[in-house]
Structure formats: structure tokens, C-alpha cells
Swiss-Prot record:
It comes from the Bacteria. This is 4-hydroxy-tetrahydrodipicolinate reductase. Keywords: Amino-acid biosynthesis, Cytoplasm, Diaminopimelate biosynthesis, Lysine biosynthesis, NAD, NADP, Oxidoreductase. One of its GO terms (molecular function) is 4-hydroxy-tetrahydrodipicolinate reductase. GO terms for biological process: diaminopimelate biosynthetic process; lysine biosynthetic process via diaminopimelate. It is found in: Cytoplasm. It catalyses: (S)-2,3,4,5-tetrahydrodipicolinate + NAD(+) + H2O = (2S,4S)-4-hydroxy-2,3,4,5-tetrahydrodipicolinate + NADH + H(+); (S)-2,3,4,5-tetrahydrodipicolinate + NADP(+) + H2O = (2S,4S)-4-hydroxy-2,3,4,5-tetrahydrodipicolinate + NADPH + H(+). NADP(+) binds at residue 39.
Amino acid sequence: MTDSTIRIAIVGAGGRMGRQLIQAVTQMEGVVLGAAIERKGSTLVGSDAGELAGVGLLNVIVGDDLSQLTDNFDVLIDFTRPEGTLEHLAICRQHRKAMVIGTTGFDEAGKAAISEAAADIGIVFAANFSVGVNVVLKLLEKAAKVMGDYTDIEIIEAHHRHKVDAPSGTALAMGEAIADAMGRSLKDCAVYSREGYTGERKPGTIGFATVRAGDIVGEHTAMFADIGERVEITHKATSRMTFAHGAVKSAIWLGKHDNGLFDMRDVLNLNEL
């Protein structure tokens, strides 16, 4: 990929996140919207992507077949669903197009497919593209190393009523950051639900609680609770635009990488801290 203006394609262009991504592209330097894609049969196919997102005419017509638009973009941004993202991944890999993946809810096979594709193309794959959330992940690593062994750890997350996966990808990323810092596997210590007679809390576990209500953009709290005190590290998002700007920033950053699997901590250089 060259250092010239990067052409962005957005799938799910008519959705809440898709429209925010289109807006973000128009607000940031070094990028232009090259393609916009919606699902086959959508009434939005054929409309102008800029008018769809409320930013005026962009002369980019919403299409429904990514494979026919690969000459129009350098980086694909995908915040859709796992099955769709994996289809787009195969197309991008075939045509050597980079990807920014914000889709959550992948199973192990899906994650493996992303890792394999990164041998050929550059991919930024993150549960959350907010700068603040990724700073929180770094803080959680530090807190877990100091307090993790003697505190009860709980992660509470809340999202809007339309979110289809639980716990959120961000909540799982928080759990993984904590578990990794303590030398554990999240698979072995996560507790995802409690109901009925559960007995006392088992030491060394990481609990998850989920709220789905209203129009909550995203709220996440990690709690380290001891007798007499507790530490809570919280992030609250009030607009999807924070995720959109992070995703576009990642696309720009990918311009310097022909292949490899990265996350937002790489983009923000947080791994050096």
C-alpha cells in the first residue's frame, strides 16, 4: 500500500455504525470513501453513501457485492456480524486488501481464519476502537498484576437493546487482559452467569454481568473487590463516533503494513508502555 490517500470501503453502510464511519471518513485527512456496501435486497442499495450518512453527496453509490468493488478501495472497515465478516475476509485476502475488523462474537474457528488471513494482508482486529477503552485495557493489566491474586474480579457491561452478543467483545477483552496479566486462561476462570443456589464465590474466578437496555452506547466496569475496599475502572462511551474515528485511524495506520495481525494497542503504541 502506498502513502497516498487511502481509499476506504465500509460494509453495513446503512447501519448505525456504518453511517458514523462514513461521517468519520469525511472528517479525517488522508482518507476518502471509495466504496459502500449493504446486504443484497436492501432498499439502500443504489443510494449515495454521503446522503445516506447525512454528509452530502459523495458520488459513492451503495453496492451489494464487495467482490465487484475491489478496485475501488485499499482498506475495508467491517463492523457487521461474524458470518458476513468472514465472507468479506476471504474476498479481501484474495485481492490483497487490508481490513479493519470491529465485528465481535467470533468463535475460535473464526478467529483462526482471521489469523491465517493476516499472513497475506494487514488486519487490525479489535473488540473496541475507542482510545479510552484501550487505555483502560492497559490499566487493567497493571491493576491485575498488583491486586488480582487477592481480590474478587467482576466485569459489568451495558449496551443498547439491539446488541446481539453477550458478553460484549470489550468485556471479554477486559477479562483476557486481566487473566493474561495473572498468567491464567480466561477460559478456565470466567463465570458468565449466576442463577439459583450457586454457593460461595470461587477464588480466582472472573465474573461477568450483562445489561441490555435502551440506547446505551457502551459502558464497562472492571471491579477488584477486597474486604474493606474495592477499585473500579470504568469506561463510558456516549457516541459511536469515538469508535468510528478509531477505526479510520487504524485504516490509516495499516497503510504502512502489508501484512500482519494487529490490534488498537499496536495502533496507539500502548504495547510500549
